[in-house]
Every structure is written in C-alpha cells, then in structure tokens.
Amino acid sequence: MTDAFCSPLDVRQIEENFAEINPAMTSAEAGVEANRCLYCYDAPCMHACPTHIDVPGFIKKIASGNLHGSARVIFDANPIGATCARVCPVEVLCEGACVEKTLLQKPIEIGRLQRYATDYALGNEKQIFEKGEPNGKSVGIVGSGPAGLSCASYLARLGYDVTIYEKKPLAGGLDTYGMAEYKMPQSVSLAEVERIAQMGVKFLTNTQVGKISESPAEAEASVAEAIANADRDDRVVPVEEIPAVQIVSFDDLMKWHDAVFLAVGLGRTNRLGIPGEDLEGVIDALQFIEKIKTREWKTVPLGKTVAVLGAGNTAIDAVTQAKRLGAERVVMVYRRTEKDASAYDYELELAKKDGVEFIWQAAPIGILEGENGSRLALRCERTDGSLQLFEVPCDMVIKAVGQQKMRAFFERLAGVEIDERGRVVVNASMQTSNPKIFSGGDCANGGAEAVDAAQMGKLAAQGIHENLSGERVRFAGSEAPSIERSERAAHHGAENNA
C-alpha cells in the first residue's frame, strides 16, 4: 500500500495509543497489593494456572521485598512468566479463581504482580537458572514459541545440548510476532529469549526444517557473525543483518539429535474460499499484527475503513490495533452471534471502548472492487434466516478466521500420527507415535494460550529426560491440565479449529 493508505496519525500519537494497557506497578502499589493476599493453603489460583505457579509463594516474597526470589518461583514453573504476566487471560484463570474475588469482588492483581517481579528479573543481570552439567545428550527443537522456549529452558537446566530451529528472523514465535503490541511489547519476548540463550541454548533463526540440509555447525556459522557483532553492541540482531533462510532436513535433524521436540504452532490463515479473496487490500490478521510488531508505524498498511472477519482473540487484536493506528471506521463481521464469539468478554469490551463496530450473523460471500471512493466492498449474507444481502464499503479486509493445521509436515516429513482435526497425537509426556519425537503447543492442542504451550513444553522436557536417561524428574507445577481447563482452552481456540 502507498502512504495514502497508512496511518494518518503522527508517531507520538501512535506511540501513546500503543502504550501497554496495563501499566507497571510502582513498588508502593506492589507492596500494598501483595499484602492483600491471604496466602491460601492449596490456593485456587495456583490450580487455575495451567503452569501451576505457586502464586501465594511469589506474592509473599514480593511483600517481603525479595523480588529475585519471587521471580525464581515464577520462572521455575513458567519460563515465559514475563510474557504470560501480560497476555494471560487472568480474568478466567488465576484471578478468576481468587478467593478475594468471591469475598470482595476484587481479586488480587496476580498478573500485574507477576509482571512486577519478572520485569525486575529481566532488568537485572543476575541469572535465575544456570545451565546444568553437560550430560552428553543433544535435543533439537523445531519452533521457538512458548512451548519451544519452555522445553529448551528445562532441558538446559538438566544439562542437555539444545538447539532451536526457527524459520523467522527473530526467536519467540507468536510471543514475538503475534501478540498485540499494546498488550506486550516485542522487547519483552526477546528479553526472555535472551535469558534462555544465556543458559546455553542455541538459536538458529531463519532456519526452516524441510527436505535438504547442512550440518548444525554449518548452519550455526551462517548466523554467528551477525549475532557476535550484535552482542558486542549489546543489541538485538536487526532483521537485515540475519542471513537468508536456510533449510535443514528433518531426516538429518533426527540423526544429529537424541530427541526432537516439535513446537511449530499452526500454519497459514484459513482460506475463505470466496471471490475476490486475493484482491489488493485483503490481508491476513497475523501478517497485519506482525507488521505492527516492528513499530515502524508508517509502513503498516491501513485503510480508512477496515473490515475484519472473525470474532476470536486474533480478530480483536486486529480491530483494536487498526483503530489505534488511526483507521476512521473499523467493522468486525462474524457469521454467528456475539455469545458464540470465541474471544474473551473483556477483549470484546476493549474493542467496543475503542469504537469498533460489530456486524453479527453475517457471512462473507465475496470481496468486490469498490465504488464511490472505496477500494473494496465486502459482500455479506445474513445468517439469521433472512438471507439478506448487503455490502460493507471498505479500503481493507483483514482475515482472522483461524489457521490451518500443518498436516503435510507431520505426516510426510515427521511421520507422526495426527488426529482427525490435524493435531499431533501425544501422550501425557508429550511423546508422539515415534518414541524419539515429542510435540507440544498449538500443533498438539489445536490452539490455546501461551501458558498452555509453556506447560506442554515443561511436560515434554520431563518426558524427554525420562526417555533418554531413565530418570524421572519433576519441575515445579508439573500437573497435567484438568479436563475442565482443556475444554475451556478448546472453546477459546475455536477460531483455529474451523
């Protein structure tokens, strides 16, 4: 798109619009809030957290001024605790289960307290956990999102030589590229990646697992110089300094490593299968969000009127960010009713406060070249039984209708079993139908929260260690997710299960 279809706002205003919606606590605020906690025995909040963080434990350490100890409790159960402090749906997890919510209708602000402690740790040079004594075993991890980072962190603590293969220029997966910037700045995800790298985990970015290959040493050498130069300047490697994408074959991956963990997430955005889907001005929501994450505001494509298709949390991220970039009108179109939307209620309320319009029970049937000054027109049909046809004039259409499962990758390349919904089949230890291959995250659960993926990465690390060493180890919060929790996650991941 040209500059005419980019944000009309000045950079200062955009920066204000994208400031974190939940501000950091001051030390005084954190102290007061921490002292409200009842420090429950067998705390409901701890059970409600998929990674089972010892919530009363870390809050009590905040109250006593031991922030390093508090952060250690958090990262012991969840290696991406700073990310989850920002993006977790705490209203339906830990804070939703808080006893104070029942008593006073005001739960302890667990998410903000967790952020307070983890931000302290990320801003402090003191390492929380160190790499374990080398045990001579090697593990390859495909994907550097929440599940991959979590698994790598625990394996490093156990002394494994861990290499993460990531196809994007930067590590962090969805946390780095797919979270709304006003919820979580990209810098937070990259800081957690850096902490895990300091534990000896190697990150081979711009590296895709495919059919041809080069050795790990050759692959690592191709990015080593750029990373070394960046390290000297104490900065994140700019995208333009990272070499072009290289391909590593899955067969060689299996030869190089004693175990492989697949944490590749989901694939491309689902196709709508309607006329006009490939017109200029039609874009995938994840592409739109990824562009915003660069914070190069004036290069982000934007229409004056934006139509977003879908009603999941990704759709909410798209509509709110389009509005905050300066779109004059943003409309969210969904084929079902508001109560059927998979987005959380508080996410919908945020979009409403931002001035987003909603059209419920309307299915897109085509995208047309626009008339009367509009670049496009979204043609819809009512799904309320009336079959009424209408058009939404717009300059941009954003598709947020879920992502495809990577069936070909798992069936043809990895050769592991998948279920009828395209999810990798795993046991309680995250082991697949191939005993050497483990899997976790969205590719195994169909699409849930970052915190769910972090827990699966933890369970996989335990499973890999037991499989390779015969030793049973349990990290903090190793309980498997409850049936109720899994069902809730499945509902809110429904946009990816279409």
Residue ranges and their predicted role:
Residues 278-303, 393-447:
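FAD-site-proximal beta/loop scaffold in flavoenzymes
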Residues 138-163, 315-323:
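N-terminal Rossmann-like FAD-binding beta1-loop-alpha1 element of flavoenzymes
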Residues 135-138, 206, 302-306, 361, ...:
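Phosphate-coordination loops involved in phosphoryl transfer and adenosine-cofactor binding
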Residues 79, 145-147, 312-314, 444:
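Residue-level detector of alpha-helix initiation sites
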Residues 133, 138-140, 190-274, 366-377, ...:
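Feature captures the FAD/FMN-dependent oxidoreductase FAD-binding
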Residues 164, 168-205, 319-366, 472-488:
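Rossmann-like dinucleotide-binding cores of NAD(P)H-dependent redox enzymes
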Residues 120-139, 249, 288-303:
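A short, basic/flexible loop-to-alpha-helix module at the beginning of a structural domain
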Residues 1-138, 257, 262-278, 369-373, ...:
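Ferredoxin-type iron-sulfur electron-transfer modules and their immediate structural context
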